[in-house]
């Protein structure tokens, strides 16, 4: 559709995904060996940022193909800029882990980072994830949940985890679309020595039913 809109005519298009094989990449690389130019585009956001393409770009570089990276939209930067949380240092983790123990380990790692940690989350897991985060971390974090960025229903929810949960519980119709979670730890409050202790804390506070929501 984009090519037609730009009146570029029918071009050779290769579909590339996380399931693409070495043979698929070699086929694409062979096109560049013929002297053609090409581009990697995404349906949404920026290629390689929680999007396929890392192995392809790496292989292209190994084959001396010149890579030109163009600035484009990415939800994590848009969310960070509008979050009100520190922007001088940040780290991006992709989607929150599905398994509760992995989530605890990740949060434990984030508690040792003196910047803002950024995650993507799906609408059907959002509330369960926030409830677990609240059980584990309570008031030890500053939270921002960004929704449907750059779209008509864009929204930012800021505050403690409890405050954000209250808003979303009262307006469940808002739990739709794409979400970015941003967490900044209050260094004065946080003192977790390891993930195992944090996981034990989780098990003592959260029911098996609640934990299973993330499984």
List the model feature ranges, each with a label.
Residues 42, 69-72, 119, 145:
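General beta-strand structural signal in soluble alpha/beta enzymes
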Residues 10-17, 67-68, 88-94, 140-145:
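Short hydrophobic/aromatic-enriched beta-strand-loop microsegments
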Residues 55-113:
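Class I SAM-dependent methyltransferase SAM-binding "motif I" and its flanking Rossmann-like core
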Residues 1-11, 81-85, 91, 99-100, ...:
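RNA substrate-binding interface of SAM-dependent RNA methyltransferases
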Residues 36-37, 115-116, 120-215:
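A contiguous loop/helix-start segment that scaffolds small-molecule binding in enzyme catalytic cores
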Residues 13-21, 73-74, 94-99, 148-150:
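Short, acidic/turn-prone active-site loops that include or flank metal/cofactor-
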Residues 7-10, 30-32, 56-59, 83-88, ...:
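Short, hinge-like loop/turn segments at secondary-structure boundaries
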Residues 1-68:
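Class I S-adenosyl-L-methionine
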């Amino acid at each position: 559709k984009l090519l037609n809109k730009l009146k570029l005519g029918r071009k050779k298009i290769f579909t590339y995904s996380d399931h693409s094989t070495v043979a698929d990449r070699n086929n694409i690389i062979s096109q560049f060996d013929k002297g053609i130019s090409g581009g990697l585009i995404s349906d949404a956001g920026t290629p390689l940022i929680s999007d396929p393409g890392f192995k392809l770009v790496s292989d292209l570089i190994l084959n001396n193909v010149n890579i030109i990276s163009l600035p484009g939209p990415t939800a994590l930067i848009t969310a960070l800029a509008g979050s009100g949380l520190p922007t001088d240092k940040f780290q991006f983790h992709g989607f929150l882990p599905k398994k509760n123990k992995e989530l605890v380990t990740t949060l434990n790692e984030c508690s040792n980072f003196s910047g803002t940690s950024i995650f993507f989350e799906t609408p059907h897991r959002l509330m369960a994830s926030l409830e677990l985060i609240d059980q584990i971390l309570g008031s030890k974090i500053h939270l921002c949940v960004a929704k449907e960025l750059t779209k008509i229903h864009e929204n930012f929810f800021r505050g403690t985890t409890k405050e954000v949960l209250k808003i979303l519980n009262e307006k469940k119709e808002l739990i739709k679309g794409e979400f970015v979670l941003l967490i900044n730890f209050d260094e004065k409050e946080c003192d977790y020595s390891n993930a195992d202790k944090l996981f034990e804390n989780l098990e003592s506070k959260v029911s098996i039913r609640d934990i299973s929501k993330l499984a």
